C-alpha cells in the first residue's frame, strides 16, 4: 500500500470542512484503489491528510487528480507519495 501525505494551508476551517464532507470525501472515496483516508483538523492554519491506496500507481493517480483539481477552500502546499510501512 501507498499513501498520499498532504500538507495544506486552511484559512477558513469551517468552509474547508464543509467542502471536505460535501465534495472531497465522496470524490476521493470513489478513486480507483482507494483504501481509506484521514483528514486532520488544522493546527492554526496548517492541515494534513493521509489517503491510503492499494498501490503506488493508484496513489500516483490520486496525486495527479489532486494536483489537477485541488479543493477550493485550501492551498495545497505539498503532496508526498509514501509507502505504508505498517498499520494496525
List the predicted regions and their residue ranges.
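Short S/T/G/P-rich N-terminal loop/turn motif that feeds into the first structured element of a domain
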Residues: 1-47, 54-65, 75-88
